[in-house]
Amino acid sequence: MKVPPVLLLFLLSSVRATEQPQVVTEHPSMEAALTGPNASSHFWANYTFSDWQNFVGRRRYGAESQNPTVKALLIVAYSFTIVFSLFGNVLVCHVIFKNQRMHSATSLFIVNLAVADIMITLLNTPFTLVRFVNSTWVFGKGMCHVSRFAQYCSLHVSALTLTAIAVDRHQVIMHPLKPRISITKGVIYIAVIWVMATFFSLPHAICQKLFTFKYSEDIVRSLCLPDFPEPADLFWKYLDLATFILLYLLPLFIISVAYARVAKKLWLCNTIGDVTTEQYLALRRKKKTTVKMLVLVVVLFALCWFPLNCYVLLLSSKAIHTNNALYFAFHWFAMSSTCYNPFIYCWLNENFRVELKALLSMCQRPPKPQEDRLPSPVPSFRVAWTEKSHGRRAPLPNHHLPSSQIQSGKTDLSSVEPVVAMS
């Protein structure tokens, strides 16, 4: 049954809001309905008596979020996500900046993707974990706004950057004779991406308040909750709906169309052109592997963020009520998308594998000094080559391209530019 207005006054007396100012985590709640200065009567009447009873009995923010099993699982999951995300995305930036031949617009976009993942890993994920463990927000007003902004801004930057990568790959493969996006233009596009992401993220970050609730003399909790301007219900609903459509569904639609056309070109086109069959097939394998890698990145991003986006959208539409365990599980699943990309790059890109091996070798015990080793009867490669050629380089066995240029399965993020136009 719905809560009578008279009973609302009694319930309000048992939960006293002692302070108001600041951000929201991602799940609005009954506290916002109780204390929000602009909470509408429709929103208040949307809960049953059982809902309000559970809230006053502190089940909503107490026992539900303190389930030991759920807490332990999410602590481990969040911790692994933070460690792997930071290590992997820093490695991505290191590899691209270190390799001169990887300096291209596509590589800049991939670095931008890694930077967005690092931002959300540092400014949102740890704070959300602590909020879940303590059932209260302990970082103050400033970080409440910053954490909320980081989550939305990183999501928007990632979606827009993946769209830019898809458009760039479409341009390179569908129109190989046209000039590619230069590094300067790539920097400009990245700047535009961040401006757009900031613009769409600020409403979520600004419309937040830090509410402090006194349940008893010993139990006081602070919560980051949304506090949208009037009409609050409609503002919240349409803001989340616009965000979901413009910065999640629309980018994924553009990406899908771009990669579908690229796949049709690569998998169905059989024109060889003025190159050998071996060179042509090697080039196609390289481009196919690159496209597969980028498509896999997009698919994982879409799958990881879909549950949380749907949850927030349904919540703002009042189709469901809040659920702590469900929200934090969806939030972790979305945050886990930040640590998958580096593993995909290392799996499908030789440059990343080489750099990872080099970093791991630095952590191993250094070899023994040269004088402690027994002399080898076999001369080194350099000595043997010099003695054999007498200072002259041996001729190549044939006139084909070096095998390193025609190996299959090696992906170069910046070398998808075809040698020949394919019809």
From Swiss-Prot:
InterPro entries xref list: GPCR_Rhodpsn, GPCR_Rhodpsn_7TM, NPY_rcpt
Q: Is this entry keyworded Cell membrane?
A: yes
Per the UniProt entry, the signal peptide is 1-17
Q: Specify the protein's topology with respect to the membrane.
A: Multi-pass membrane protein
Q: What is its main location?
A: membrane
Residues modified by carbohydrate are 38, 46, 134
The record's annotation in PROSITE patterns points to: G_PROTEIN_RECEP_F1_1 (PS00237), G_PROTEIN_RECEP_F1_2 (PS50262)
Question: Which Cys-Cys disulfides exist here?
Answer: 144-224
Q: Which residues lie on this side of the membrane: Cytoplasmic?
A: 93-107, 168-186, 261-293, 349-423
Residues in a coiled coil are none
What keyword terms does UniProt attach to this protein? Cell membrane, Disulfide bond, G-protein coupled receptor, Glycoprotein, Membrane, Receptor, Signal, Transducer, Transmembrane, Transmembrane helix
Extracellular topological domain: 18-71, 130-145, 209-238, 316-327
A Pfam family assignment: 7tm_1
Q: Where is this region: Disordered?
A: 389-423
Superkingdom of origin organism: Eukaryota
Outline the inducing conditions.
By glucocorticoids and cAMP in T-cells.
Instruction: Show the GO cellular component annotation of the record.
Output: cilium; non-motile cilium; plasma membrane
Describe the family membership recorded for this protein in Swiss-Prot or TrEMBL: Belongs to the G-protein coupled receptor 1 family.
Protein name as it appears in the record: G-protein coupled receptor 83
Gene designation per UniProt: Gpr83
